[in-house]
Structures are given as structure tokens and as C-alpha cells.
């Protein structure tokens, strides 16, 4: 059995579209990998496993409907915690935004979702990454 977590996005997209792998199985494989390494890596700021698996099942059901699919249909994608989402906290790596979310998704999240991607969650970012500060010349 091939380790799907080692495949490129292109290869995963091909396997998802052909039905060789399901979105649910792919998401479960990623969750297993996260469980294995998260204690040491501490990469995730927000990850709702139950919601991820629900969205994966929805993607698989939609795929079976025969309706047109986006190029990233059923593909799990992680985003940094500075990218705004309405259904997940966007804390920007600071306690001042603890559990705050946006009123709408950012443009990149809209593009990903419209392409069929599943937003897995938010990865950790450095505090105030979103700010631009002057530099010395």
C-alpha cells in the first residue's frame, strides 16, 4: 500500500478524481500522520478532526453524483493562522485575537473552496506576522 501522505498534490488530485482514493481515506491518513508527529512538531493552531471528516465524506458523496468537480475536489489543505476564515479562529499568533474569527473567508480561502479543497485547519504562525514594520536601510 502506498503512503498517500508522501504524494504530490498533483498525484493526489489525479487519484482523487479517478476514485483510486477517497477524500475520507486521505484525510484519515493525514490525521494519523498528525497524531504521530504533532506532539513534537506542534504545527497546528486549530484542527477540527470531526468537521474535517464530515467535509471529506461530503466531498466523496458529491464526487459520486457525477456533477463537475473542481481541480482540488476533496483535497485537504492547511492554511496559516493569518488567513481569515469565518468558521475557524484567526488568531494571527497573538493572544489579543484569541478565539476570534472573521465575518467572511479571505479571497484565497474562497478560491481554495471553489476549487473543491477542504480546509483542514490553521497552522501556527509567528505573532504579528501580518504586520509590516519599517526596516533600517
Locate predicted features:
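Enzymes and membrane/adaptor proteins characterized by extended Gly/Ser/Thr/Asp/Glu-rich
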Residues: 39, 71-111
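Short alpha-helical functional segments enriched in proximate histidine and acidic residues
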Residues: 33, 37, 55, 59, ...
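Short, solvent-exposed turn/loop segments enriched in Gly/Ser/Thr/Pro and often Arg
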Residues: 123-128
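Flexible, acidic active-site loops/lids enriched in D/E/S/T/G that coordinate Mg2+ and/or position polar
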Residues: 49-72, 79, 98, 102, ...
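An N-terminal boundary/leader segment
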Residues: 1-54
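Single conserved hydrophobic/aromatic residue that forms the stacking wall/gate
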Residues: 130-137
Amino acid at each position: 500500500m502506498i503512503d498517500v501522505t508522501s504524494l504530490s498534490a498533483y498525484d493526489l488530485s489525479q487519484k482523487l478524481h479517478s476514485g483510486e482514493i477517497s477524500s475520507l481515506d486521505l484525510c484519515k491518513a493525514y490525521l494519523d500522520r498528525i497524531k504521530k508527529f504533532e506532539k513534537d512538531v506542534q504545527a497546528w493552531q486549530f484542527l477540527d478532526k470531526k468537521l474535517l471528516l464530515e467535509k471529506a465524506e461530503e466531498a466523496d458523496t458529491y464526487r459520486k453524483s457525477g456533477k463537475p468537480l473542481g481541480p482540488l475536489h476533496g483535497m485537504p489543505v492547511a492554511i496559516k493562522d493569518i488567513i481569515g476564515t469565518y468558521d475557524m479562529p484567526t488568531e494571527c499568533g497573538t493572544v489579543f485575537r484569541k478565539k476570534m474569527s472573521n465575518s467572511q473567508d479571505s479571497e484565497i480561502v474562497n478560491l481554495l473552496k471553489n476549487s473543491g479543497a477542504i480546509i483542514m485547519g490553521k497552522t501556527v504562525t509567528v505573532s504579528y506576522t501580518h504586520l509590516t514594520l519599517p526596516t533600517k536601510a
